[in-house]
Each structure stands twice: as structure tokens, then as C-alpha cells.
Design a protein with these regions (language model features):
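Terminal-region recognition feature
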Residues: 1-165
Length: 165
């Protein structure tokens, strides 16, 4: 997936916007912006006695993309002392849906669309390569399902039903 540089940041307002494929470039930029804002909050927290961290607002309008890049941003959000609120402004699909779920608080608009689906990939290679790829896909799929169950009211049965469609 190629990034079209549709990720925006207004660090003065602590507002970020993901309107691109979830890939190394777009997630790298967002992660950097978030980490910078967290660092600034950490410094203020040390200097000011009653410093109150204002939330970072992450607006999402993305079809998704790379599951590996997705996890990098999710871990930063989940481990942030600064609250990060996610907003779906149109659609949060696939990897973008899981990023949305990471928000400390989550908001969506009336016409927002979400999509969760089973993982897909295209592989070729020698037999052993394919066996190892299958094991990796099984592990990633399990990790994804557990995360969605943990962050939503969906049950394992709900996830299984979605996956079988």
C-alpha cells in the first residue's frame, strides 16, 4: 500500500487525522506526533504540580491496511498516560477499526461505518515457507480476535460468526 500523505497533525490543538492506508509511513507519522505530545505532557507533568493532561484527539477515516503497522500505533495509544480519544469520521475498516478501538474514549458520528473481517493475505513460496506463513496467520488472527473481544462487547461466538461469513 502506498501512502498518499493524508495524515494530518495540529499539535497545538492535539488533533491528528488518519485518512490514509494503514502502512509504515502513515502510522510512523502519527506515532511520532503522538509520542511528541506525550513527551511534552510528561515534561509539564514533572514541572507543574497539578498539571492536567488534555486528551489527544485522533480522527480516523481509513480503509485500513497493514496489521503489523497497526499494532505499533495501538500499543502507543494503549500505554499512553495522556488520554487519546478516537473519532470515526466516515469509516474505520479493518486495521483502522482496531486502531479506533484503542481509544481511551471512542466516538463516532451518525453515519460512521465500521468493518471487521477475517484476515487475508497472498503468499507463495516453498512448502515450508507456506507452513510457517500459516502459523503466523493463525497467531495474528488469534491475537486480533482476542483484542477485539477485549475492547468491545463482542463475544467469541460473535467473532466466529463474522469470520465464517
Amino acid at each position: 500500500m502506498s501512502s498518499k500523505d493524508n495524515s494530518y497533525a495540529n499539535t497545538d490543538k492535539k488533533t491528528l487525522f488518519l485518512s490514509d492506508d494503514v502502512d509504515n509511513e502513515s502510522i510512523g507519522k502519527l506515532t511520532w506526533s503522538i509520542l511528541q505530545q506525550i513527551r511534552e505532557d510528561d515534561e509539564k507533568d514533572e514541572k507543574e504540580k497539578n498539571y492536567k493532561r488534555e486528551p489527544i484527539k485522533l480522527y480516523i477515516n481509513s480503509y485500513g491496511g497493514s496489521v503489523y503497522d497497526m499494532w505499533g500505533l495501538i500499543d502507543v495509544i494503549l500505554n499512553s498516560k495522556t488520554p487519546i480519544y478516537t473519532y470515526c469520521t466516515g469509516y474505520a475498516m479493518s486495521a483502522a477499526f482496531k486502531i479506533f478501538l484503542a481509544g481511551h474514549k471512542r466516538y463516532c458520528y451518525k453515519h460512521s461505518t465500521f468493518m471487521y473481517h477475517q484476515m487475508s493475505c497472498w503468499r507463495s513460496g516453498k512448502y515450508q515457507d507456506l507452513v510457517e506463513d500459516r502459523e503466523e496467520m493463525d497467531w495474528l488472527n488469534k491475537k486480533n480476535e482476542e483484542y477485539v473481544i477485549d475492547r468491545t462487547n463482542l463475544t467469541k461466538d460473535d467473532i466466529d460468526e463474522i469470520r465464517e461469513k
